[in-house]
Amino acid sequence: MKKIFLLAFIALTIVACERKTATDVVDANTYTIDAQGNMVEGLLKDSLLFATEIDKVLATEQAHCRLVPIFRTRKDSYGNSYSGTVNYYERYAEEGIRFQSGNSWHDNLIAGFKTIYGSEMVNVSLLNLQTKQKKYLFEKPVLIENIYYPAPIRDTLNHKPISRDYYMISCYDEDTDKNGYVNRGDLRRFYLFNTEGDRVKALIPKEYSVVGSDYDGVNDILNVYARLDSNKDGNVDANEPKHIFCVDLKKPENTVLLY
C-alpha cells in the first residue's frame, strides 16, 4: 500500500549508533544534486511529492494500540522501487543487570521497550483498534532515527513486571543549519508521546542535539548524551560542550540535567 505525502522535510536515515543500511541495491537517489551540481545528503526541505510504503504492524503493550512505521520509497539503478524495513535493536550478551535474578528483558535494550530503526523512516501511524481511528505522530514527514515503544511481552525489572505507557522518538524534524536540507547535519530532537499519539514534550531542549544514550537498569533511567549548539549555527561538532540528561522512565516528564 503506497501513499503520497507532501514533503516538508526528509533526509537519509542512519541510527545513532553505527550500523550499515540493509540493502544490496545501488541507490542512485539517496543524494540530492544541488544547484552547483554537488551531491548533498538529504532532500530539499521545501514542498515535494514522494511515495511511501509500510512494512509491518507492530503490537504494543496496550492491546488496542498498534504502530505502523512509514518509509520513503526509492528506486534502484534499474528503476525498481524499494523501501526501508523495521529493524530491532537487541542485546544478547550476558552482561550486567539484565541477566541478574529477577530481570527478564527478552533481549530488549531497555526493560519494557522495543527499540526500532529503519532506513528513511519518515513517520509512524498509530492505529486505535477500539475506535478504528489512525493518527500520524508527526504532522509532516521527519527523519526518524529510532522509536522506543511499549513491548507487547512484559519484561521484569528487579523481580517486578514492568509497564510502559508512552513512546519516545528520536528524529530530525527541522532544517536547523539553514542549508535547505534536513539531514544528519541538523540538530537531532527527542520527543515524548502518550499512547494516544499526542506529543507531550521535548525531552531534550531544542538547542541541543542528541548524540547517544545508555540505560541504567538499576535505577530505570535513560541517560541521554547531547551536545549544545553553543555557536547557534544549527549543527554540532566535537568541540561543542557535551551534556548528560537523565530521563526517569517511571516519570519521563521529569528530565534532569546531570552534567
Q: For each of these PLM feature ranges, what is it?
A:
Residues 161-162, 176-184, 229-238:
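Acidic, glycine-anchored loop motifs typical of Ca2+
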Residues 143-168, 207-224, 259:
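Conserved beta-propeller blade repeats
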Residues 113-117, 168-175, 223-230:
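Beta-strand C-termini and the immediately following turn/loop, strongest in propeller blades
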Residues 1-15:
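Sec-dependent bacterial lipoprotein signal peptides
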Residues 135-140, 200-205, 253-259:
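Beta-propeller fold detector
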